[in-house]
Swiss-Prot record:
The chain crosses the membrane at residues 2-22. This is ATP synthase subunit b. One of its GO terms (cellular component) is plasma membrane. Pfam families: ATP-synt_B. SUPFAM superfamilies: F1F0 ATP synthase subunit B, membrane domain. It is found in: Cell inner membrane.
Amino acid sequence: MFVVKMVLGFLILLSPLCATGLDISQTDIIERSLNFLLFAGILWYFLAKKLRSFLRSKSLEISKRLEEIQAQLKVSKENKKKLLKELEQAKEKAELIISDANKEAYTITQKYELQTKIDVENLIKNSKALMDLEVKKIKRELVESVFKDLRESKKVSFNAQDCVNILKQRL
């Protein structure tokens, strides 16, 4: 079929030369053309199947390689989506952890502030109580020392009822 197409194509190409009226009897162009067509036909006959099978195998190899690359691309896209999803989850988890840490820090701060306030109030109370006790102790010691000095001086005489009344008024 191909040979027939080649012969017809060759004849169509040579037809303008025949129409011009040139004398080509002195040349061997027709024999050479027929030899070329015969050579091309024989070459085609022997090599066509091998050439077709070679081209088919190359086409199959290329399509296989393309399918492999597309499969790898699909796997890569899926991995990318998976990793992006994991990254989003990690970001959300980090935000949650930070939020919880801030809440916990605030709670701990409030707790220690309250405890410190209570401790300060207790210290103030205790120091006031200690100061009151010390004041009473000092008053008592002062009264005792004054009474002792007065008893020893013998200038002033007190009976027991007078001592009790003075002590009640001063303490």
